[in-house]
Amino acid sequence: MKVLWAALLVAFLAGCQGKMEPELEREPELEREPELHQQADWQSGQPWELALGRFWDYLRWVQTLSEQVQEELLSSQVTQELTALMDETMKELKAYKSELEEQLSPVAEETRARLSKELQAAQARLGADMEDVRSRLAXYRSEVQAMLGQSXDELRARLASHLRKLRKRLLRDVDDLQKRLAVYQAGAREGAERGVSAIRERLVPLVEQGRARAATVGSSLAGQPLQERAQAWGERLRARMEEVGSRTRDRLDEVKEQVEEVRAKLEEQAQQMRLQAEAFQARLKSWFEPLVEDMQRQWAGLVEKVQAAVGASAAPVPGDNH
């Protein structure tokens, strides 16, 4: 009897465990349908939605908790892949947001600030929930490594439950973000149309004025004979050329007068310089002439003295007669 009860208990536990394994990999069909619908939209959406679709596909693969997934979860490969996909998604999302902000320039500052604040909050929620996914997988890896070979069925079940909840939160975040972006894009489109309308309102009166002026000139010209119009053009051209010639002659006369003034000034300055040079030369002559005359007198006296001394030494000396 005890053996029978033991066999029944073993069979029951094996059935429970066998039922648990597919449960980790299986998702309710009602939950999967909206995900598939949203994923189809992501595949044909903006670049940030395509990046989000790649992140979602990788997360679905992780949630299967297959043997390969469990092996990679024990290393840092899964978290590294998720980090790269998260960074790519947020980068594309920021680029798309910046593009919409440029298109929102014609919109009022208050409206643009409010839309930007709401969109930034939705973007932050999506980033936080994606970060929760990565943190939860990192925590699972730490818990598995700490068990040291013990059974990890309970950890896998708890991880699968957490991942399902996080995926639901991510779906809500993405839906909210898409709605905010749609409002943002509608505001940008409205602002662009408003800017074009304002430009059109300013240009239409100018175009009408130009048309009216062209029509007036055309009608006045059409009413004149061709010969009269040619004569009128010739008279205007002749008057214009005479005006240009008169201005040119006046300008040449001014240049000639300026040249004459410059030449007269140069001649005057040259004459002044000649007079100054002659006066300086006369002053030098008056300085040095007395000195030269004095030197000449001294030299003549010296020569006379030398000649006298030479003559005296050359005179014969009388000898003794013995």
From Swiss-Prot:
It is found in: Secreted; Secreted, Extracellular space; Secreted, Extracellular space, Extracellular matrix; Extracellular vesicle. The modification Methionine sulfoxide is found at residue 147. Residues 84-260 are annotated as: 8 X 22 AA approximate tandem repeats. Sequence repeats lie at residues 84-105, 106-127, 128-149, 150-171, 172-193, 194-215, 216-238, 239-260. Keywords: Chylomicron, Endosome, Extracellular matrix, Glycoprotein, HDL, Heparin-binding, Lipid transport, Lipid-binding, Oxidation, Phosphoprotein, Repeat, Secreted, Signal, Transport, VLDL. SUPFAM superfamilies: Apolipoprotein A-I. One of its GO terms (molecular function) is heparan sulfate proteoglycan binding. Heparin binds at residues 166-169, 234-241. Residues 214-295 are annotated as: Lipid-binding and lipoprotein association. The modification Phosphoserine is found at residue 151. GO terms for cellular component: chylomicron; extracellular exosome; extracellular matrix; extracellular space; high-density lipoprotein particle; intermediate-density lipoprotein particle; low-density lipoprotein particle; multivesicular body, internal vesicle. Residues 162-172 are annotated as: LDL and other lipoprotein receptors binding. One of its GO terms (biological process) is acylglycerol homeostasis. APOE exists as multiple glycosylated and sialylated glycoforms within cells and in plasma. The extent of glycosylation and sialylation are tissue and context specific. Glycated in plasma VLDL. Residues 1-18 form the signal peptide. Residues 283-295 are annotated as: Specificity for association with VLDL. Residues 271-322 are annotated as: Homooligomerization. Glycans are attached at residue 216. InterPro entries: ApoA_E (IPR000074), Apolipoprotein_A1/A4/E (IPR050163). APOE is an apolipoprotein, a protein associating with lipid particles, that mainly functions in lipoprotein-mediated lipid transport between organs via the plasma and interstitial fluids. APOE is a core component of plasma lipoproteins and is involved in their production, conversion and clearance. Apolipoproteins are amphipathic molecules that interact both with lipids of the lipoprotein particle core and the aqueous environment of the plasma. Belongs to the apolipoprotein A1/A4/E family. Homotetramer. May interact with ABCA1; functionally associated with ABCA1 in the biogenesis of HDLs. May interact with APP/A4 amyloid-beta peptide; the interaction is extremely stable in vitro but its physiological significance is unclear. May interact with MAPT. May interact with MAP2. In the cerebrospinal fluid, interacts with secreted SORL1. Interacts with PMEL; this allows the loading of PMEL luminal fragment on ILVs to induce fibril nucleation. This is Apolipoprotein E. It comes from Ateles geoffroyi (Black-handed spider monkey). The gene is APOE.
